[in-house]
Amino acid sequence: RIIAIDTNPAKEAWAKEFGATEFVNPKDVPPVEGGDAMVQHLVAITDGGLDYTFDCTGNIHVMRTALEACHKGWGVSTIIGVAKSGEEISTRPFQLVTGRKWQGSAFGGVKGRTQLPGIVNRYLQGDFKVDEYVTHREPLSRINEGLEHMHEGQCIRCVIDLA
C-alpha cells in the first residue's frame, strides 16, 4: 500500500499515476478530541501505523504527524522537505523510545560521485519517471506565472526556461 496525502484533491490523479494506491485529504478526516485526527486516522486504516512515512512539505506540524503515524517498534519517518529558517521540530520522547525512527534525507541519500552516474544511466534507459514530474514550462519573462502554478497547486513542477 502506498498512501498519498495532500490537501489538494486535484493531486489525487497525479499521485495514483506515480504509484499511490490510496489518497487521503486531511480536510476530509473528521476532527477528534484529544489528539491529532490524521495520526489516529492513519493508525486506524493501517492496523497500527505506517511502516514508512516521507514528509516533503517542510511543514513542522506535518513532520511530527508523519512520525507519530508510524508503527511502534519499526516505523521510519523520513523528512525531505525543508522547514522555514529558524523553525524547530519536536515530539515527545515516547515516540522514539517505542522504536520509531526519525531521519532526514538530502538528495535521497545518493552519493554523488559513486551512485549518481548509475542513476542517470537508469533514467536514460527509462527506468525512472522524471520528465513526467514537469507539468508546466514558462520562459523567464513569465516566472511569476510559474510560481503561481506552484502556489495554486496546478502543477507538480514548473521549469523556468532561462533561454
What label would you give each PLM region?
Residues 1-65:
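Adenosine-nucleotide cofactor-binding segment
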Residues 8, 83, 108:
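Residues in the short beta-alpha loop(s) of Rossmann-like NAD(P)-binding domains
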Residues 19-24, 44-45, 95-97, 120-123, ...:
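Short, hinge-like loop/turn segments at secondary-structure boundaries
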Residues 21, 75, 156:
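Short acidic/polar active-site loop segments enriched in Thr and Asp
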Residues 48, 64-68, 113-163:
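C-terminal hydrophobic helical "lid"/dimerization subdomain
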Residues 58, 81-82:
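Short glycine-/small-residue-rich Rossmann-like dinucleotide-binding loops
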